[in-house]
Amino acid sequence: MKKIINFILGAFLALNLSASVAYAAAKEVRIAFFMEWATPNQEDKVKKAFDRAFGVPVKWTNFATGGEMTEAMLSGDIDISYSQGLTPFVNAVNAKAPIFLVDIAVLYGMGGTTCVVSNASGITKANASDLEGKKVAVPLGTMADYVFKETMRVVGADPSRMRVIDMNPEDGSAALVNGDVAMACLFGGKSIKKAEEAGSKMLTVAEAKDAGIAGIDITSVTNKFLKENPGMVKAFVEVTHEANARYNSGKSDMNVIAKDAAMDLAGTKKQMGGFEFPDASVMKKKYMNRSGILMTYLKVMGNMFATSENPALKNYGKVVTTKYLP
């Protein structure tokens, strides 16, 4: 009997040990995020909740654009990209990049991503076609690029006739203030605030909403990390959803979030006031189901940014999973 008990205990310990090793195959988790883009899970980032959930250290790296996040994932430097724009994700999977969409990070209106036109140019939505022939700053392949195309469609201007310059939001806002471009399309609280020192939004948040222009940021993971560390992916999503629930119930430490986002408290509250952090049930029923909003956006953007070299996928459901949602 003693031998049997010892055997069972030994087997139990071996099983737990193997499970632990499988869960913590990575010795470090490398996560991409954006500064000036305040989200509830930054409180958990600061308080090391992710490190505790993973059982290993976390290395957080700030990127200027979602395209840079993709490049870092492909080079093996990043495992998880948090709040990557849907546009750079679409561009990546159209190019057959080995990454997967596992969660929706943020839903937002055009308060967080917008196009600001120079006041000195005298251009508004009423004469937006005057932008044709002029320099416009756009971080190509990002959600701001999508907003640029959609905004120009709404105001009746032809983007192909503009001199589009690929600039990250910080540089784009500086170029607008310096008079080097007539319009800058950008994201991020500080960059938009800087741009508005010299310009005004082409469309108000309400006008953009009425036109159906909205943003979705997602969480993407490399296929390699997903295969080797599924438990860590699930842990990341769970901690993030716990943070979202805390924020939605008014219990987040906004001072901690603001400081980590490199923003002031008022700006952080204003920005996050325009964000939505849906729970898992809403995601499954409304966004990530076969005919859901996310899947529709993927198809629309996939075709919008498709090229002959990187055509749109026939089925974006193959690069999306709800398996890791709580």
Please describe what each predicted stretch is.
Residues 1-9:
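Bacterial N-terminal signal peptides that target proteins for export
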Residues 8-18:
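Bacterial N-terminal signal peptides
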Residues 18-25:
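Sec/Tat signal peptide C-region and signal peptidase I cleavage site
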Residues 25-155, 163-166, 182, 186-189, ...:
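Short, glycine-/small- and polar/acidic-enriched structural segments
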Residues 106-117, 200-225, 279, 320-326:
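Periplasmic-binding protein-like
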Residues 165, 171-260:
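Pocket-lining segment of extracytoplasmic ligand-binding domains
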Residues 227-308:
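Secondary-structure end/capping motifs
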Residues 298-326:
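Conserved C-terminal helix/tail region of periplasmic/extracytoplasmic solute-binding proteins
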